[in-house]
């Protein structure tokens, strides 16, 4: 959403890397020149008429992947933070797992900050409800195999959030693995996750994992 400042450089770095798959831009009702940049550069994109938010945009991409019979889909931000050299590792990881998370903290300690405190709370909530340890639950760089693509495409309110991952572990027997990655700084624009929004997000995720996800129905394989 509104990533005109970094979209072209992100896609060009993707195309210049060893990545040899397809890509699709999800324009989530952006008010900037995102759509024009896609048309000018002939980038394949879905142009959503209104801003659906992260969950809606993500599910639109998953519906596309499911309808076109992809067996792997990778969530990749347009702000320049995600690095394309890690895509092959994520793709390989979902050959034997359902979800692969690009993790900054598999081998590194989390820095001390309010945002990382929230990440720790979510990590504990996932551990309590699923028995699994996910060191970087808020990472936005994730890969999904064909089974998860179908679940995400057909399910209601399935977004790329820690509470959904927790639910899929508990109710769909999803196998989740973390792949060590490095991430860059945002190259343009501003993140919506300022201090206030980050605190609200972390609290909402923690409550959802602890109290809401555990009562949702199990889904079949």
Question: What residue spans do the PLM features occupy?
Answer:
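Conserved catalytic loops of nucleotide-sugar-dependent glycosyltransferases that act on lipid-linked
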Residues: 57-58, 81, 85, 111-220
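A conserved acidic beta->alpha catalytic loop
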Residues: 27-35, 80
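Short, acidic, metal-binding catalytic loop of nucleotide-sugar glycosyltransferases
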Residues: 12-21
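Conserved short acidic donor-positioning loop in nucleotide-sugar-dependent glycosyltransferases
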Residues: 14, 28-29, 52, 61
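Conserved donor NDP-sugar-binding/catalytic core segment of glycosyltransferases
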Residues: 88-111
């Amino acid at each position: 959403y509104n990533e005109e400042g970094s979209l072209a450089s992100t896609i060009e770095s993707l195309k210049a890397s060893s990545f040899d798959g397809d890509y699709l831009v999800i324009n989530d009702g952006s008010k900037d020149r995102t759509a024009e940049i896609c048309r000018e550069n002939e980038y394949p994109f879905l142009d959503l008429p209104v801003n659906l938010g992260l969950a809606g945009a993500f599910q639109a991409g998953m519906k596309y992947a499911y309808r076109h019979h992809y067996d792997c889909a990778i969530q990749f931000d347009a702000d320049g933070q995600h690095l394309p050299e890690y895509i092959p590792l994520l793709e390989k990881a979902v050959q034997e797992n359902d979800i692969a998370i690009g993790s900054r903290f598999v081998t590194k300690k989390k820095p001390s900050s309010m945002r990382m405190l929230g990440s720790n709370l979510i990590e504990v909530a996932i551990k309590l409800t699923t028995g699994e340890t996910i060191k970087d639950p808020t990472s936005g760089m994730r890969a999904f195999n064909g089974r998860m693509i179908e679940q995400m495409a057909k399910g209601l309110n399935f977004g790329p959030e820690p509470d959904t991952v927790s639910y899929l572990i508990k109710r769909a027997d999803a196998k989740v693995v973390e792949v060590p990655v490095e991430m860059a700084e945002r190259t343009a624009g501003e993140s919506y996750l300022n201090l206030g929004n980050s605190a609200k997000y972390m609290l909402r995720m923690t409550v959802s994992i602890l109290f809401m996800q555990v009562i949702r129905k199990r889904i079949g394989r």
